[in-house]
């Protein structure tokens, strides 16, 4: 476990989905789990009573050490494409109205290091880059989460 008073900055992905009155960040692999605005996101585990994350268990908020590792996860959802006889993995074509955010995230509390990243107790977006989103959506997320958001 990493014990530090300074947050760890890592990378992760989010879906950007409309929830009633506004677009919100939603976990990339756990659908329908929205990240709260202007307050920390806290890991929960219904399997054990201890605070997440716990060694030997898969609970916690996941994040990658590098942007490249986060992009690799995104590519795994798209498959491989052939281009001029060479195999390439491309970022996915986005469905209309379903943008994705890749960005840096602050992690703190109980943090467990893994080979390619971390699992944390608490997290909050630090900086976001939208894939498939327009300037107006970037502005909405910027105001809602109070972080820098850039359309890609």
Indicate where each model-derived feature is located:
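Extended catalytic/binding region for NAD+/ADP-ribose chemistry, centered on the ART fold
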Residues: 51-76
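A glycine-rich, hydrophobic loop/mini-helix early in the fold
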Residues: 41-52
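Conserved NAD+-utilizing ADP-ribose enzyme module
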Residues: 1-37, 41, 71-152
């Amino acid at each position: 476990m990493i014990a530090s008073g300074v947050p760890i900055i890592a990378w992760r992905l989010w879906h950007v989905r409309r929830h009633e009155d506004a677009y919100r960040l939603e976990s990339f692999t756990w659908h329908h789990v929205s990240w709260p605005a202007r307050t920390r996101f806290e890991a929960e585990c219904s399997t054990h009573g201890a605070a997440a994350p716990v060694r030997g268990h898969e609970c916690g908020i996941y994040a990658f050490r590098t942007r490249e590792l986060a992009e690799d996860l995104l590519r795994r959802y798209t498959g491989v494409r052939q281009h001029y006889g060479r195999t390439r993995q491309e970022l996915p074509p986005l469905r209309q109205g379903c943008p994705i955010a890749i960005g840096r995230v602050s992690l703190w509390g109980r943090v467990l290091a893994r080979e390619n990243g971390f699992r944390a107790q608490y997290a909050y977006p630090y900086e976001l880059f939208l894939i498939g989103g327009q300037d107006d959506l970037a502005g909405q997320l910027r105001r809602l989460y109070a972080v820098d958001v850039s359309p890609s």
